[in-house]
Amino acid sequence: MKKIILAIFCIATSTAIHAAVKADEALALAQKVNNYFMYVSEPDPTADSHVGGKTRLSNVWMRGTYYNGLINLYEVDARQEYLDYTYKWGSYHQWRCHNDKYWDNITNADYQCCVKAYLDMYDIYGNDSMFVKAKVNFDNEVAIKRIDFWTWIDAIHMGMPAFFNMSNVTHDPIYRDMAFQYYMHTRNAEGGGLFNTDTGLWWRDKNYTDKNIKSDVKKKEGFPCYWSRGDGWVFAALCHTMNYIPDHTDAYYQQFLADYLLMAKALKACQQPGGWWTASLLAPELYPDMEVTGTGLFLFGMAWGINNGVLPADEYKPVCDKAYEALAACVHDDGFIGFIQGSGSKPSDAQPVEFDSVPDFYDFGCGCWLVGVSEYVKLLRACEISLS
């Protein structure tokens, strides 16, 4: 039935401007973007993340986010070079969360983001070395028996998918159980609860809730203050995590799905006429330009919803089509992506964001673009198959 409905919708929109793009065209653009990253920006996957004068280890959240995008690209473009690049990176870091001597006791989710890619590689190769050191880190963390580690919503993206897949890999539910408690604490208790179920959007951390935000911050960030990339982190994390829960009657899956659907409705209403989302979701006038990281993550989440039968295509495929057009327009002739907001925690950080902007770190922005466009390729292929 889902395929029939999608086919009818694709036929009805086949002459519309937004339906003109083909899966192969979107994939070719994704290959171009990724080739720039792998062969121009970061030809050595073991090197530190760098662009704008800052450096960070290449196994923290910035690079981990890139590999989320690369692995999603691999699912639609199964090139061995993607796996070779990922393997060289992971093996160099010994499949650990950090390179320092305290790697086994780190509880900051920024340093655990890479574990999702490690476990995805394990799912492909079945090599235990790809997860055993991350398991040591996770074991030490859950033994602390605290549930308040995720004090900012980015951490949901950095940590939750990896914890859930660690349970799949080890057949031990402790990791998913703890991650669910972390999530619910962030959702309901941290700073009074960071998920506003009335709006369907998340505050980045306790400093931006309606109750706590300061007057000068309201003027600069917008009020209510909902940061595009922050909400994108959560939206994408819910999708990645649901991918690791095969039983859709599972109580955790049902909770994530309910939150996801609230977010999807809210985010759809925030999309700008040009197809993008702005850095401050409910105050687009402050920073009206395109912002790639949030837009890429939202495209991923909405295309995922259609692909998995939880969002109606007639309502959300036009949203995806417009988002793809906006993301495609950000790509330079050589494959470099413009309009990436650099690292930060709020809408005003790294502004202005423009076509020629060079962010302080490029890798995570590329990953957000890739994860969205590759999921959109899956959607376009499903549509093309339904019409054949």
Question: What does each of the following model-derived ranges do?
Answer:
Residues 26-46, 84-101, 129-149, 176-214, ...:
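Long, well-ordered core segments of solenoidal/helical folds
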Residues 15-19:
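Sec/Tat signal peptide C-region and signal peptidase I cleavage site
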Residues 7-10, 21, 25-64, 72-109, ...:
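CBM-like carbohydrate-recognition segments
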Residues 233-282:
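Oxyanion-binding "anion nests"
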Residues 166-174, 241-254, 307-313:
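Inter-helical turn/loop segments and adjacent helix faces that build the functional surface
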Residues 133, 138-168, 196-243, 288-294, ...:
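The feature captures the catalytic groove of carbohydrate-active enzymes
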